[in-house]
């Protein structure tokens, strides 16, 4: 089950199962390796020659080679398996370093808009229209805003992580938009707000603001409990969001877009 979840890029749920495995079977190298793959968001995809290669969806400043779980992989592997794990880890580590370089070259953002752009049929979602409207309003107010449709336009999914990572770490506010249970529980959207909550836990200057309409209390992620929310779809929506943002992002520190 953990492998299936990881295959579907549901890394948090997969990691929970791998943790259960390693708690019960402390000498199971595959369990620790699974935790590594989840931590760095590794998906195996075909390259141009058809070979399966690791694609990273969660970069970190922490080296793979120095990770405690990787050390446990090494301790609990035979010599043949150890060599295979080390080669895979080196590839992931090289990708991590490359992605960090790209991320550090990016301009910082003030606001990250998290939303589900397309539904399971590939059609544009209702919440994507709201996201686009907010993006236009906020950029007009001179905020630098990360919106995936704009920031990642023309990029392959396998190349997006450095830009997402940079935006998640630099933005002082995340607006988590939703009009349904599926909007918040889409794997990629959940990946965004989960990671941002982890960052905000370490940096109290960062703030996640759930913004929703037509979502009942049972469909709101439990992780949002205690957070100040904004209701979408009424006349005061934008003013309320702007007021919340202004409390977090001081105007003098706004990362204004460079002039054309």
PLM features: residue spans?
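Alpha-helical segment of the N-proximal tetratricopeptide repeat
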Residues: 1-20
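A conserved position within tetratricopeptide repeats
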Residues: 15, 22-23, 39, 74
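Alpha-helical linker/edge segments of TPR/alpha-solenoid repeat scaffolds
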Residues: 38-104
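Conserved N-terminal substructure of TIR/SEFIR domains
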Residues: 90-177, 197-207, 236-260
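Membrane-associated lipid acylation/remodeling enzymes share a hydrophobic transmembrane-juxtamembrane segment
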Residues: 188-215
